[in-house]
């Protein structure tokens, strides 16, 4: 499985990392910090036998993709184990999703995950993962206290 992900400017990254760290500290679940998972937003997940199969599509995408503005407005849960922050699904993100899918979707011997197809993708940045039911409640409380749309 190969993932295509967005990474953020330094200011956004610091803020998202603070949320991740606070959840780890308050819940005792250190999956994100122990595995050094940086704040990121996965745009696509592609099954392929090798990276070489994807190289032409990646090279094509590199010339067409650009930076954009994202506004994070809410928190959420992917039950039963994940806490996240989510942006507005604006034109930039919608177009990005479509462009990546168009580049990867028809490659021979590959498959784009159903969760990352246009109009079925839920853009989010994971703040906590592998959380128990109790840890989810604590993580939700943490984000209720510290999260402000930005």
Feature-to-residue mapping (PLM):
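Short, low-order "capping/linker" segments at domain edges
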Residues: 82-94
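Long, low-complexity, Ser/Thr/Gly/Pro-rich intrinsically disordered segments that act as flexible linkers
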Residues: 76-77
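Basic, often amphipathic N-terminal segments
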Residues: 1-69, 91-149
């Amino acid at each position: 499985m190969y993932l295509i992900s967005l990474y953020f400017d330094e200011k956004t990254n610091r803020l998202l990392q603070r949320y991740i760290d606070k959840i780890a500290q308050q819940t005792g679940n250190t999956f994100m910090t122990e595995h050094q998972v940086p704040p990121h937003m996965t745009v696509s997940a592609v099954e392929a036998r090798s990276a070489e199969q994807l190289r032409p599509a990646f090279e094509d995408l590199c010339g067409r993709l650009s930076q954009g503005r994202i506004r994070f407005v809410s928190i959420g849960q992917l039950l039963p184990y994940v806490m996240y922050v989510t942006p507005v699904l604006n034109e930039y993100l919608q177009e990005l999703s479509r462009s990546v899918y168009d580049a990867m979707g028809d490659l021979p011997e590959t498959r784009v995950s159903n969760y990352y197809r246009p109009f079925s993708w839920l853009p989010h940045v994971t703040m906590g993962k592998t959380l128990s039911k109790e840890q989810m409640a604590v993580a939700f409380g943490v984000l209720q206290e510290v999260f402000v749309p930005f």
